[in-house]
Amino acid sequence: LVCDAAGFHNTYMQFVQCAVLGLALAVYAVTLPECPVNRGGEKKSLVEALGLRAFTLFRQKKMALFFIFSMLLGVSLQITNGFANPFITSFRGIPEYASTFGANHANALISLSQVSETLCILLIPFCLKRFGIKNVMLMAMFAWVLRFGLFGLGNPGGGVWMFILSMIVYGVAFDFFNISGSLFVNNETDVAIRSSAQGLFMIMTNGVGATVGTLGAQAVVNRFVNSQSSVSAMTAGWSTSWLVFAGYALCVAIVFALVFKYKHDPEAIGNVGH
């Protein structure tokens, strides 16, 4: 919001702003209480020291499926981060939408996603207890379908409500899978490799999945948007691209619902240690 209000979104000052905020957070981090790592008394091998024992979890069908779907869903994570702004801003080239708030203040509109992300964290304990980890992860997957689909159908004029709704469901899409997935790993792994398993979860989602998703999304946008010569064709291409992303997320959600088996235990959720 500050970046948008100050007009930094099209200048190098946005990076200066981020640098200042980063330094402020670094100073704040120094003031946090000390949390020493439990290293244990035994000598560890190089494999254990590097956390590679977590890869043995792929021998378990349930964990292997979970990590594979984590990667598949991770494909969706960075798509809107990279393309939401240029998509919404592109409407400035269409006279009908050139003067709309959304087309001229895309960052302010997109910032609603972060507000939703913050608030949706508060819903996770209730939803996990009530519906279970699998259903919460399914909610996240279908939320990604809505996130992309609403982008594909909306516009910053009369359809701006679809953009706003897309920003709202982002909180469910992002939080519900990342938090519930982390709790799943916590519940299903031995304490000796739990930290490494959490790292593997992050690698599969924000590492492999996000990288594949960014490259794949760029290919889709190049095919349907950047290859067009007219503004109207590019706008139609953006809509097609978002619907392609929505279709992908829908396929992942359906297959996950069919092949991933997990029995909900409310007590296990309630007794998760931190």
Regions found by a protein language model. Name each.
Residues 4, 82-106:
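Short amphipathic helix-loop junctions that connect adjacent transmembrane helices
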Residues 4-20, 219-249:
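A membrane-interface helix-boundary motif in multi-pass transporters
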Residues 24-33, 238-274:
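Multi-pass alpha-helical transporter architecture, strongest
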Residues 142-156:
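C-terminal ends and interior cores of transmembrane alpha-helices
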